[in-house]
Amino acid sequence: MASLPATAFDQGALRAALRRARRITDRHAAALTRLDAVLGDGDHGDNLSIGFQAVDELLDELPLETRPGDLLRAVGHRLVATVGGASGPLYGTAFIEAGFQAGDADALDPALIADMLQAAAAGLSRRGRCSVGDKTILDTLQPAVDTFKAAIDSGANAQDAWAAAVAAARAGMRSTVPLVARRGLALRLGERSVGHLDPGAASCFLLLVALAHP
């Protein structure tokens, strides 16, 4: 399976990744909602599907020459406006912070992508007041971010770094099953949240797959 270009990721590649995010959230909406019916209010998949449909429409509205950073910030604001529940502000913040980190770059090299991912994770953590181990999106995102950066710092290209990051994200997602929820609606379940996959961790994994794989 092919991955991101080994050198740079321009706005065309970013648009393609975001359109994949719409397709993958549509495809898995029912499964995400089933997960959320156990730990949340049973609408996570539907909300994300609506949000990324709105992102798809945004991509048709924005000029093709829109820089990646501006594009990501616009996506973040659209997600905040259209995704219900806690996930809209969380994912929206992640995209907005990544966009700010991108600055006015016309193309995103692997080192810049690593910095953008870290900014996204830090922003999400601040907005959600969550840490790794709280049974949230961050349990998937932070291991992926750390693994991507470590791979790039060791000299790997983006393709290999993304492959490693997706593997780390999958492991992080699965790590939420035995955890007790410490944030969100699942917090009210206490020990009863053990044994269930966190829906936000699952959707984060899917979005990282969309970014990494055509």
Question: Can you annotate each of these PLM segments?
Answer:
Residues M1-P214:
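N-terminal loops that bind phosphate or other acidic moieties
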